[in-house]
């Protein structure tokens, strides 16, 4: 058990870290070999924890020694000298950290195992040759070894290369995961070189590189044959090398590119390295540690293979390789351009496109962007249009590598065919036999090798790959977009390439996620200006049918059902990529109801581009994620003069927010320009004061015809006040919902009251939910209701109203001029004490027909008071919802008596109440001819045959009565379904 002193010390240390430092601490923590209990803890809990909570998690899941070592080593790695000294002084026994001076795995047995004569020299000679080749092929466009620093940042998380990592009895399995092109393979190869570096290790160590791209082409073999294929000179030494497994590092590169049927990696696994097996079986045996269990493993993969890997790897350590972070990209631009102004302008252009900026984490994409924009700037061209879309940038890069009028039509067709065939086959590396099968000559590729579109493997000269996966996707889209020659296979069936409809189908994309971005690029190539640019350079023409094919596919997508949020996001992204207004008009024309979830500024831009053409749109549901707008920032004005004077001098975060607000302004114009838009829902949204004001500005305009508005769970709290202010005097508004767990401020109450008392107010439905108001505020609100003549339906569900507040409302409703017809007080913390005054309302009210008291513990006494009101001849109540109100048998007796007296009640909800035998008493009323009840909702009684039979008899005697017994617990329908 961890000592209280250690827990207190750890908490004190962690609480001194700022937000960024705590985030770094967690990242470094992940690189440590976690103990079993901590390893099973959901990492999301660790990510969300503050310093105090993180300390609690660690002391509850890890041993004292582990906590001491990990804390001191991580603080030292973060260069937090003072905190590190404090940790050593307070936490360490004997004042020492248990560090590992020798980074090797294994134990004393390793040192006693000697290599054969000549084996050591032969292995190191081979590795030195390999090292020279790898070091020359790591990065595209490297500047002053810039990428080495980025790689080293990730390399320190590899535990078997970190001398400070605590010794582990079992060997490590490390998984490097991340998107394509961010440097996973480079990092893995550098780890191999460091593992075998004679300067770092006094004993001989071995490393074997297993490329899954290559292994997919191999037939059955033994494991010894598998690893010796690249080392023929060491073939005789393989048995003695494998006998020293604790000295071996295996790198399994690109697990996601291993083409195997589901489950192939976990079938027929074996531990005999001399036995011939299919390559997937050998890899599965290695990962499951059936084969050479004492070896260290380093696996690289894209995220899509992580789920399968979890079934194979034994207690893996996951290291996310992120490539270039934002600061890396900025530094890269500065080095590439040389001129700071040009570099920062280009960098801001890339950052303005979220999709392009995300791709920029790959060094190759950063190089493409820099190369393209620098050339444009040198020519005096405006680079802004180029960065609007990824298609525009990639097309400009492609055309810039060749002179205009080069007439390379055939060569470009060949290249696009190669890209498409590879993408459909989920293949990124092409061998000579692949080229031969497609009828491609290696000489056909020379131009694109020289233009840095393709790369040739310096080790295997007959292997080719594209500069980046995204560029292969772009060229695949080009395959579909180019006009085909007479007699040419239009859809590529001869090469197992799907047609456009198949490309855009959800089924194919699930099997091959790389196809998704091809659709975006294909829309981008449907642009007329881009078609002319391509024709001017290569002499190629775009197919006149491609735009129509895209329209047909998208029409089919939402022909029979409304689009999901994800599908809509993709459609809008594709339309923006096209930059074709006419195309957007045709695609969005059928939309009448849509739901949007905005997660970044690019999505705001996509929506504003297309939805302004959606003139038949009637309902819009909007959700804005945290981070789209910045909080707690200086309130900058948006006038043009301000931006011209200060744009380059204000902080980056403010500049980014200014851009977000400009795009948001364009998006919000939809509310004042579309006369058919009647319903707006804003829910679970993180807005800012400025973004709320912009939205309200468009809502207040006379050209906005919104009738129904729902604002639910929105921040900041002041947004509710601003919306109330915007709706004052809004004639068209008939339904308003303001829900969310917020504290009412006086100004918001004033705005809401002004809205209700305004002579133009036509509000018929008002819902207030989750508000904490004082009795004085409720009194002010209910006082205003006296003067309002339009409001018919009031829902105060989930408010802290209490009996005191409810009685103030009932007092208002006993006045002869109140107009409320429907009242919901669900979950307002009411008791039987308020029901006597409510009964008086039932007696005198000529308007009230619907009443909901669900989830209030009024009990049988409360029901008694209500039934007294129901029994009066002048009572007009038709629907009464008493779901989950603590009603028992006695309450059923009161209800039965009221129903038999021919009261006006036609709908009654008693679900989620333990009425037990009270049901028999209630059934007496249901069989009485004076009972007017038509719909009764009860708790589920499927398992009670006696009650089931009783209800069937009641239905036979009263065929006009509907009894709903499917309303219990979590499956109970919402009260509002029954109430309206």
Swiss-Prot record:
CDD domains, per the entry: Pyrin_NALPs
GO biological-process terms attached to the record: cellular response to interleukin-1; cellular response to lipopolysaccharide; negative regulation of cytokine production involved in inflammatory response; negative regulation of interleukin-1 beta production; negative regulation of protein processing; regulation of inflammatory response
Mutagenesis / variant outcome for changing residue 379 to N: In HYDM1; uncertain significance
LRR repeats: 614-638, 674-697, 760-784, 788-810, 817-840, 845-868, 874-897, 902-928, 933-957
Residue numbers spanned by region Disordered: 104-123
GO cellular component, as recorded: cytoplasm
Domain spans labelled NACHT: 172-491
Biased amino acid composition, Basic and acidic residues: 113-123
Reported effect, residue 511 to R: In HYDM1; uncertain significance
Induction (UniProt): By bacterial lipopolysaccharides (LPS) and IL1B/interleukin-1 beta in peripheral blood mononuclear cells.
Disease: Hydatidiform mole, recurrent, 1: A disorder characterized by excessive trophoblast development that produces a growing mass of tissue inside the uterus at the beginning of a pregnancy. It leads to abnormal pregnancies with no embryo, and cystic degeneration of the chorionic villi.
Similarity remark: Belongs to the NLRP family.
Oligomeric and partner information: Directly interacts with CASP1 and IL1B.
Protein name as annotated: NACHT, LRR and PYD domains-containing protein 7
Species for this entry: Homo sapiens (Human)
């Amino acid at each position: 058990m961890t000592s209280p002193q250690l827990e207190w010390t750890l908490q004190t240390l962690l609480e001194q870290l700022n937000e960024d430092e705590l985030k770094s601490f967690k990242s470094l923590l992940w690189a440590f070999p976690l103990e079993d209990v901590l390893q099973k803890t959901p990492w999301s809990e660790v990510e969300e924890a503050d310093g105090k909570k993180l300390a609690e998690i660690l002391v509850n899941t890890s041993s004292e020694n582990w906590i001491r070592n990990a804390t001191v080593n991580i603080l030292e790695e973060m260069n937090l000298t003072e905190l590190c000294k404090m940790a050593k002084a307070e936490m360490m026994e004997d004042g020492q950290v248990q560090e590992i001076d020798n980074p090797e795995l294994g134990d004393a047995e390793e040192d006693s195992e000697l290599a054969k004569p000549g084996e050591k020299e032969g292995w190191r000679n081979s590795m030195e040759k390999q090292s020279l080749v790898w070091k020359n092929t790591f990065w595209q466009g490297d500047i002053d070894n810039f990428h080495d620093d980025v790689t080293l940042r990730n390399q320190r998380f590899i535990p078997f290369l970190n001398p400070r990592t605590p010794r582990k009895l079992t060997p490590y399995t490390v998984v490097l995961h991340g998107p394509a092109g961010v440097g996973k393979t480079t990092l893995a190869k550098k780890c191999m070189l460091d593992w075998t570096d004679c300067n770092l290790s006094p004993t001989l160590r071995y490393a074997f590189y297993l490329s899954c791209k290559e292994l997919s082409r191999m037939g059955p073999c033994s494991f010894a044959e598998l690893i010796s294929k690249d080392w023929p000179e060491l073939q005789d030494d393989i048995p003695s090398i494998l006998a020293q497994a604790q000295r071996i590092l295996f790198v399994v590169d690109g697990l996601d590119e291993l083409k195997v049927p589901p489950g192939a990696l976990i079938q027929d696994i074996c531990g005999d390295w001399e036995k011939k097996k299919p390559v997937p079986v050998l890899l599965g045996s290695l990962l499951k540690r059936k084969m050479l269990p004492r070896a260290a493993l380093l696996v690289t993969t894209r995220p899509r293979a992580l789920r399968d890997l979890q079934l194979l790897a034994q207690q893996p350590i996951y290291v996310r390789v992120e490539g270039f972070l934002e600061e890396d990209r900025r530094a890269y631009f500065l080095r590439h351009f040389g001129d700071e102004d040009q570099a920062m302008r280009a960098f801001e252009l890339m950052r303005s496109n979220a999709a392009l900026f995300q791709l920029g984490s790959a060094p190759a994409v950063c190089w493409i962007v820099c190369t393209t924009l620098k050339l444009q700037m040198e020519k005096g061209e405006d680079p802004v249009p180029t960065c609007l879309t990824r298609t525009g940038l990639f097309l400009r890069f492609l055309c810039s590598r060749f002179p205009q009028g080069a007439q390379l039509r055939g060569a470009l067709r060949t290249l696009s065919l190669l890209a498409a065939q590879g993408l459909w086959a989920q293949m990124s590396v092409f061998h000579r036999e692949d080229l031969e099968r497609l009828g491609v000559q290696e000489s056909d590729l020379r131009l694109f090798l020289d233009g840095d579109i393709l790369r040739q493997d310096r080790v295997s000269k007959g292997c080719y790959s594209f500069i980046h996966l995204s560029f292969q996707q772009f060229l695949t889209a080009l395959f579909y977009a180019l006009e085909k020659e007479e007699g040419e296979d239009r859809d590529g069936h001869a090469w197992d390439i799907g047609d456009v409809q198949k490309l855009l189908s959800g089924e194919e994309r699930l099997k091959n996620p790389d196809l998704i971005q091809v659709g975006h690029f294909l829309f981008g190539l449907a642009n007329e200006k881009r078609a002319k640019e391509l024709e001017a350079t290569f002499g190629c023409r775009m197919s006149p049918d491609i735009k129509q094919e895209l329209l047909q596919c998208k029409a089919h997508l939402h022909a029979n059902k409304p689009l999901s949020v994800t599908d809509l996001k993709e459609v809008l992204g594709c339309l923006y990529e096209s930059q074709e207004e006419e195309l957007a008009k045709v695609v969005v024309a059928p939309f009448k109801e849509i739901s949007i979830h905005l997660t970044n500024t690019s999505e705001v831009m996509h929506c504003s581009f297309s939805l302004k053409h959606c003139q038949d749109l009637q309902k819009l549901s909007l959700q804005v994620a945290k981070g789209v707008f910045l909080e707690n920032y200086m309130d900058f004005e948006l006038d043009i003069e301000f931006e011209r004077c200060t744009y380059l001098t204000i902080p980056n975060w403010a500049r980014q927010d200014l851009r977000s607000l400009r795009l948001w302004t364009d998006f919000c114009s939809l509310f004042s320009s579309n006369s058919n838009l009647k319903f707006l829902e804003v829910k679970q949204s993180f807005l800012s004061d400025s973004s709320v004001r912009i939205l309200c500005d468009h809502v207040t305009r006379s050209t906005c015809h919104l009738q129904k508005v729902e604002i639910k769970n929105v921040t900041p709290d002041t947004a509710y006040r601003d919306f109330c202010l915007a709706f004052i005097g809004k004639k068209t508004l008939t339904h308003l919902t303001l829900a969310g767990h917020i504290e009412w401020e006086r100004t918001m109450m004033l705005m809401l009251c002004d809205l209700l008392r305004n002579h133009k107010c036509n509000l018929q439905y008002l819902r207030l939910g989750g508000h904490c108001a004082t009795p004085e505020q409720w009194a002010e609100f209910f006082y205003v209701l006296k003067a309002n003549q339009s409001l018919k339906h009031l829902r105060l569900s989930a408010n802290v109203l209490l009996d005191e507040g409810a009685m103030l409302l009932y007092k208002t409703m006993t006045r002869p001029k109140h107009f409320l017809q429907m009242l919901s007080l669900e979950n307002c913390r009411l008791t039987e004490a308020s029901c006597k005054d409510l009964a008086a309302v039932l007696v005198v009210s000529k308007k009230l027909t619907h009443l909901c008291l669900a989830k209030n513990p009024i009990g049988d006494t409360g029901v008694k008071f209500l039934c007294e009101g129901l029994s009066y001849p002048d009572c007009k109540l038709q629907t009464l919802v008493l779901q989950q109100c603590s009603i028992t048998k006695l309450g059923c007796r009161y209800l039965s008596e009221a129903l038999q007296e021919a009261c006006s009640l036609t709908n009654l909800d008693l679900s989620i109440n333990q009425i037990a035998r009270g049901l028999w008493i209630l059934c007496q009323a249901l069989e009485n001819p004076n009972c007017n009840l038509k719909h009764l909702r009860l708790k589920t009684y499927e398992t009670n045959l006696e009650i089931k039979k009783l209800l069937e008899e009641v239905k036979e005697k009263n065929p006009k009565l509907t009894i709903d017994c499917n309303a219990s617990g979590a499956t109970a329908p919402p009260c509002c379904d029954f109430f309206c």
